[in-house]
Design a protein with these regions (language model features):
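Binuclear metal-dependent hydrolase catalytic cores
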Residues: 1-186
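Metal-dependent phosphodiesterase/nuclease catalytic metal-binding core
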Residues: 28-33, 133-255
Length: 255
């Protein structure tokens, strides 16, 4: 498998000379297995450049097929979809894979971005074939030669980590998550107050989910001095990512 980062920033895209090395686009990753299964993880502004590259391949001929894994639907993770060129080419096929939520679907959320007050092209007018598949948290799925595991993260709303296994390798993608001992966030996670027993169970579970993966991709929105008094904002530090990678025995860490 090959994993490419097209966007690594959070909250909003940036364009500054001191950020050129890692780029300024918001979250988007692309994974392709040796067998040709293609997975897009989130549609921040980085998905725009990914789309341009895809149009140079079979997607430009209307022959492309990809899965789109939805980590969560905060705006910095979906704002690029209206500008994703392969959506506008008839014959292309995409399946949004997302956790089921009560009262709202991923189609509702994406269509909202295309409301004529925000964007001139209605979502239903996109030329590509777009399907949807919902899963329950903890469910494991198989798409082509890729096996996907799912885990709920500690972030406002419903946020999902994915474990992708293919070609004898594995990677875990944790985009947005917070220190569980400092706050409890997200649908069904309970109140915001820390709880030692819950934190211990969560830590054990997320470690097991990541255990033995060749690569862990993990949120590191803050550095240590920045996170003080901001633990409730749903993000971690590079040190937090390193500690999880050490507990889980991951071979490589990207943050």
């Amino acid at each position: 498998m090959k994993l490419t980062f097209y966007g690594v920033r959070g909250s909003y895209p940036i364009a500054r000379p001191d950020n050129v090395r890692y780029g300024g686009n918001s979250t988007c990753l692309f994974l392709r297995t040796d067998g040709g299964t293609e997975l897009i993880m989130d549609g921040g502004s980085g998905v725009v450049n990914l789309g341009h590259e895809m149009m140079e391949r079979e997607y430009g001929r209307g022959e492309g097929k990809s899965l789109i894994l939805v980590g969560h639907t905060h705006w910095d993770h979906i704002l690029g979809y209206p500008f994703f060129t392969p959506f506008y080419r008839e014959g292309n096929s995409f399946t949004f894979v997302s956790a089921g939520q009560t009262g709202v679907s991923i189609q509702d959320i994406l269509s909202g971005q295309h409301n004529d007050l925000h964007f001139p092209v209605p979502f239903e007018n996109l030329a590509a074939k777009i399907d949807y598949q919902e899963f329950s948290i903890g469910e494991t799925m198989t798409f082509g030669d890729a096996r996907l595991g799912t885990f709920q993260l500690n972030h406002p709303g419903l946020t999902v980590a994915y474990r992708i296994e293919a070609d004898g390798r594995s990677c875990v993608i944790i985009t947005d998550t917070a220190r569980i001992h400092a706050s409890r966030l997200g649908d069904g996670m309970g109140g915001p107050e820390p709880d030692a027993a819950f934190a211990a169970r969560y830590t054990e579970a997320v470690t097991a989910f990541c255990e033995g993966a060749d690569l862990l991709v993990h949120d590191s929105h803050f550095i240590d001095h920045e996170i003080r008094d901001k633990e409730h904002r749903g993000h971690c530090t590079a040190e937090d990512a390193q500690k999880l990678a050490e507990r889980a025995g991951n071979r490589s860490l990207a943050h």
